[in-house]
Amino acid sequence: KARQLKTSILRKLGRKEEALALVAESLQIDRFNMGCRFEHYLLTRDVKVLEEMKELMRGWAHGYIEYALDFAAAGLYEEALSLLECHVTGTTEIYPVVYYAMGYFHTCKGDESKALEYYQRAEKENHSYCFPNRIEEVLILQDALRLNIHGAKAAYSLGNFWYANRQYDNAIACWEHSAAINPAYPTVWRNLSLAYYNKRDDKQKALETLEKAYALDEHDSRILMELDQLYKRLGRPHSERLAFLEAHLPEVEQRDDLSIERITLYNQSGRYAEAKELIAARNFHPWEGGEGKITGQYVLCRVELAKIALSEKRYADALVLLDETDACPFNL
């Protein structure tokens, strides 16, 4: 970072040869000093230099943001913008913080109308995996909210930052603000539900917001899983939970955890033969934290069916069922 800054200063002073020498020396030490590589391009305007830098950067938005922040920290907003523009050019799906950062750099330059334009662009990008984690991004997103009163996604993203950093009241305030601007975004309601339940012990609000999230996107199998888990924690009757899951079978069948919950509910309802059939019909994939869940249901349904067989004096059937509990089949 210091070498990039010194190179920038030399370039600004018109001492091009010294700047180029420092770039060469710096790249001998660290070939991945992208700040110096970009300075090399600014000094020479050699497209090959730029293309080599872009190849090494692999289109990784976070790398571009990091080096752009280095330039911006020195007041080199034009250079920061130019670097991010290199990433944007030719990229089809832009990580939203790239546009938010470009907007903020325009604010720092005193051009708030241009800043607003970039903030509005950022709102249109996919925020599914937008999780800001730099302290500078707080200032960036706060400025986006200041200039763009319709910035629902900026509020949502800032809430993600606050929640990850245990500032739960700030996170909830941001998500509530986001939901007020755009009540049609399911993920913000889902996030609010988790915060209400886990951080405020407000079970009613948690239920209302998660049901709203699922109503907005009934094809989201993850939200379905979380809603069923909430129903479970709140003591929803087995019959209601099972009916709810079976009303959304395509989504249930996308996930092992939901499929296991359905099987468990069959066993808990005494429908052991149906549970046994469902277990045999699916290939399960154990996950961390889920060890033993499906194998437990596999054993349970057979033991209970064996008890029924014994009560009906079908001793051979009972022995077959109990023998099957000695080892689990490969589909589990």
How does the language model describe each region?
Residues 8, 42, 69, 104, ...:
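Residue-level recognition of tetratricopeptide repeat
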Residues 11, 72, 107, 163, ...:
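Position-specific recognition of the canonical hydrophobic site in helix A of tetratricopeptide repeat
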Residues 19, 80, 115, 137, ...:
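Single-residue signature of alpha-solenoid repeat helices
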Residues 24-28, 55, 86-90, 123-124, ...:
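Conserved structural position within tetratricopeptide repeats
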Residues 31, 58-59, 92-93, 127, ...:
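Short coil turns that delineate tetratricopeptide repeat
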